[in-house]
């Protein structure tokens, strides 16, 4: 299910008997927080954190996607410096001009891990404004 979006199709296999046939397997990383860092030309233009929707009720904290009651928020979001650093490094290594990097932070070992780079991230609200401003500056330099 490599063409899925929004975290749909995720299966957590806690033991070998839970495995299902698929095209991609990845290790689960315990996390305290999950962030989306929007980057253009090496600069952070927007920072969001995944949070439980107020009306979500009981949720599965391992799979933090929209269908499971999570949304991206930007109010009062502060991340460890390593979250921004690994996001910028991932963009640099991938040679992409812009994208939204999903990063989880494990506070037990104080490490940030890149989950993926979204090359066509969903944009709405203030994120659209931030991208428009950043692209204007980028194209006018």
Language-model segments: residues:
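Active-site nucleotide/adenylate-binding loops and adjacent lid/helix of ATP-dependent enzymes
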Residues: 1-35, 40-45, 77-85, 138-141
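Short, charged, surface-exposed secondary-structure boundary motifs
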Residues: 7-11, 56-57, 126-129
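Short beta->alpha transition motifs characteristic of CBS
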Residues: 43, 47-54, 117-122
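Generic structural signal for well-ordered beta-strand positions
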Residues: 45, 60, 113-115
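Flexible internal linker/loop segments at domain or repeat junctions
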Residues: 54-77
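Short amphipathic alpha-helical surface patches that serve as generic macromolecular interface elements
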Residues: 80-88, 111-114
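C-terminal active-site "lid" helix and adjoining low-complexity regulatory extension at the edge
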Residues: 92-96, 105-141
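Hydrophobic residue at the +6 position relative to the catalytic HRD Asp in the kinase catalytic loop
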Residues: 101-103
